[in-house]
Amino acid sequence: MTSQTLEKIVAPHTGKPDELLVVAEKLMDRYRAIPTAALKLMQQQLGLTSTEIQSILSFYHYPVTDTPVRCHVEVCCALSCHLQSADNVLQHICRAFAAEPDQVTDDGRLLVARVDCLSDCDRAPAVHINGQRVSASDLDALVKHIKQALA
């Protein structure tokens, strides 16, 4: 990760604070995390306070770390997913990888995040691995998908 790469991602949105989420999503696509150097750059370029930036990043469970997360698993816990046992899915994944919800693992490779909505209510409980929809109907298969993403 270079400052030039970060600049290329953030600069097109200079002076557009309403595009914070767009910038964050681009950083997540590239690094699967928000590099700490990007925080200051977003603050300067977008004209937002660090509190405003942190509130958005924490709401979307975007990890701020200089070690790119290899695998970002999102488990929807909104009402329709909750009613379809999203908590069991989350617990199964966390047990399988000795992970804590909403925290990057000690080795920096995995984040299992509880999210408020993935807009996949018809596929409840909804799970995304690195932004891709996956089925949570077979928990063992889900663990295999995550292992493949970590490989």
Mark where each language-model region is.
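Signature of N-terminal electron-transfer/Fe-S-associated modules in redox systems
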Residues: 1-151
